[in-house]
Swiss-Prot record:
Name this polypeptide is given: Tumor necrosis factor receptor superfamily member EDAR
Induction remarks: By activin A in 12 dpc dental epithelium.
Species this protein is from: Mus musculus (Mouse)
Signal peptide: 1-26
Alphabetical list of InterPro entries matching this protein: DEATH-like_dom_sf, Death_EDAR, EDAR_N, TNR19/27/EDAR
Topology with respect to the bilayer: Single-pass type I membrane protein
Gene: Edar
Length: 448
């Protein structure tokens, strides 16, 4: 009886283990974005935030926390507001925006740009983002531009007063250098166009001579009709010579041989005709078979992502926490698709792209063998290995796919395909913050 009781206990043991694992995973799924499940108290606890000038190292959130999680100071020329934000690069006021530095940046604050540099102006109808603060050269400014009126008048007055001198103002030097660069660029364009046209002409001439010296098809195929025409003549002559040959052999054996040979000919012709009919019927049957349609209908960005999510939910046996997180990310993605439809990745802010590039780098997570990097993302876009080898980070990949005509929703779809939902979530949050759209409220988690 004791042995029977032990067997019953062993049969219930796997069920208890599975139930305990499911309850633990359900508890992890109830934790928020910046919360982890405390095994001691059994409750969700807030991840330790970082101070200003620091960024989080490793990952913490959604019920899990790495053992090496902590905060590290920002490197030089970068800043962070603290909390759970990563360090971002300071604004390059003079190099990128062509503006003066109003307040230099430090580890806790970003740099603030002032007015435009001399000889530059700001567009009136500029976009309401970081690119709207870029200053442009007065050489390309429309007439009567307020910022460029004093510069152009000063240059004209100075040139009229010192017409006989050899000294030039810095603005005139810049104008002279720009004009020289413009002439050089024009000469390069003309030279490249000439070389391209000459190469096309050489290729066309070579193809013309090849087609001219190539023998024509009817000349090659003229011999079989000649042979077929000679064949009936030979058979006709043999038919004419047949009676004479019969007379020359009076023996019965030889006569029987001659008379027996024509009887075999109809039989062989019937066999050949039957074989030809069989081959013809086979060819007709094979021609009537419909060819498979290899061209699939193009799928929309959102529909393909929803189909991918359904397929993942059916085939994979993942925990309820990961499924709820995937649903949250898909809801945010659906909202982002309507905001950035038709926009290329390079139209996003520089800090947003740099953050995504860092998340896709090989040094972002310690699990290098599991987490996919920007190289896997490049392979999903169909780039060749030699082209991927010439890139150093995700920023160059974003420039490449933007040049190829890919949009932001297509980039998000590829990130989901390589199982980088953390990058999708971070990029969607930055896009909504940049566009000023409130993210959709996530539904409460289902009770296990």
């Amino acid at each position: 009886m004791a042995h029977v009781g032990d067997c019953k206990w062993m049969s219930w043991l796997p069920v208890l283990v599975v139930s305990l694992m499911c309850s633990a995973k359900a508890e992890d799924s109830n934790c928020g974005e910046n919360e982890y499940h405390n095994q001691t108290t059994g409750l969700c606890q807030q991840c330790p935030p970082c101070r200003p000038g620091e960024e989080p190292y490793m990952s913490c959130g959604y019920g899990t926390k790495d053992d090496d999680y902590g905060c590290v100071p920002c490197p030089a020329e970068k800043f962070s507001k603290g909390g759970y934000q990563i360090c971002r690069r300071h604004k390059d006021c003079e190099g990128f925006f062509r503006a003066t530095v109003l307040t230099p940046g430090d580890m806790e604050n970003d740099a603030e740009c002032g007015p435009c540099l001399p000889g530059y102006y700001m567009l009136e109808n500029r976009p309401r983002n970081i690119y709207g603060m870029v200053c442009y050269s007065c050489l390309l400014a429309p007439p009567n531009t307020k910022e460029c009126v004093g510069a152009t008048s000063g240059v004209s007055a100075h040139s009229s007063s010192t017409s006989g001198g050899s000294t030039l103002s810095p603005f005139q030097h810049a104008h002279k250098e720009l004009s020289g660069q413009g002439h050089l660029a024009t000469a390069l364009i003309i030279a490249m166009s000439t070389i391209f046209i000459m190469a096309i002409a050489i290729v066309l001439i070579i193809m013309f001579y090849i087609m001219k010296t190539k023998p024509s098809a009817p000349a090659c195929c003229s011999s079989p009709p000649g042979k077929s025409a000679e064949a009936p003549a030979n058979t006709h002559e043999e038919k004419k010579e047949a009676p004479d040959s019969v007379v020359t052999f009076p023996e019965n054996g030889e006569f029987q041989k001659l008379t027996a040979t024509p009887t075999k000919t109809p039989k062989s012709e019937n066999d050949a005709s039957s074989e030809n009919e069989q081959l013809l019927s086979r060819s007709v049957d094979s021609d009537e078979e419909p060819a498979p349609d290899k061209q699939g209908s193009p799928e929309l960005c959102l529909l393909s992502l929803v189909h991918l999510a359904r397929e993942k939910s059916v085939t994979s046996n993942k925990s309820a926490g990961i499924q709820s997180r995937r649903k949250k990310i898909l809801d945010v993605y659906a909202n982002v698709c309507g905001v950035v439809e038709g926009l290329s990745p390079t139209e996003l802010p520089f800090d947003c792209l740099e953050k995504t590039s860092r998340m896709l780098s090989s040094t972002y997570n310690s699990e290098k063998a599991v987490v996919k990097t920007w190289r896997h993302l490049a392979e999903s876009f169909g780039l060749k290995r030699d082209e991927i080898g010439g890139m150093t980070d995700g920023m160059q990949l974003f420039d490449r796919i933007s040049t190829a005509g890919y949009s932001i929703p297509e980039l998000l779809t590829k990130l989901v395909q390589i199982e980088r939902l953390d990058a999708v979530e971070s990029l969607c949050a930055d896009i909504l913050e940049w566009a000023g759209v409130v993210p959709p409220a996530s539904p409460p988690p289902a009770a296990s």
